[in-house]
A protein has these predicted regions:
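Glycan-recognition and catalytic cores of secretory/periplasmic carbohydrate-active enzymes
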Residues: 1-196
Length: 196
């Protein structure tokens, strides 16, 4: 999948390497973190720079994998805590602002096409039988907003956590012991889970 999404998946492990540096002070971890950041999170587009300038919204990037992209920005935020470069914080804040403007649905999730940013704020009312608004995207957005809330103190991030938690996250909980046979495309009472 690294080739499919421009290397974004591989870049999403930035956060653990920054944390390893914080725990050990081993410069190799910091150097590797800085290498990941130097890629701009994608082999064919500098997503970090695009977020600093708000030139394009996340659904307009060459690669739009929501969970991995947000994980990359979680790592950049952790790096900001180490180095204190306000430009890094600006990139993360702008990224989340753009997600909330273009890819945040009424229930508090993103990605009406699987787990991809796809202008969900507009597309959320389109009929679809496909997989959409995956829980991994909800949880990662909530985590990123929790970190921004701690750093900035801006209550808008608490609002996102609340909306996403009470709607998208709790709505995804299977409290009825329902089973799913994904390989067969059947879930619960014979309804298709994935169009076949």
């Amino acid at each position: 999948t690294t080739n499919i999404y421009g290397g974004m998946h591989s870049c999403s492990l930035l956060e653990p390497f920054v944390k390893l540096y914080k725990l050990t002070a081993e410069k190799n971890y910091l150097d590797f973190s800085e290498y990941i950041i130097s890629t701009g999170f994608s082999k064919d587009q500098d997503i970090i720079s695009l977020c600093k300038t708000k030139e394009k919204r996340p659904f307009e990037f060459n690669h739009t994998k929501a969970y991995e992209m947000m994980s990359c920005f979680e790592g950049l935020l952790e790096y900001y805590k180490v180095k204190g470069d306000e430009e890094d914080l600006k990139a993360v804040v702008n990224f989340v602002d753009m997600v909330l403007e273009s890819d945040y649905t009424i229930i508090g999730c993103s990605g009406c096409t699987h787990e991809l940013f796809d202008n969900s704020s507009v597309k959320q009312t389109n009929y679809s039988e496909g997989v959409m608004q995956e829980t991994c995207v909800t949880v990662t957005l909530m985590k990123l907003c929790a970190r921004l809330l701690m750093i900035t103190g801006d209550s808008k991030y608490a609002d996102v956590i609340e909306r996403s938690g009470y709607n998208a996250l709790f709505g995804a909980v299977n409290s009825e012991n329902q089973t799913m046979k994904r390989a067969l495309g059947i879930v619960w009472k014979g309804k298709e889970a994935v169009p076949v």
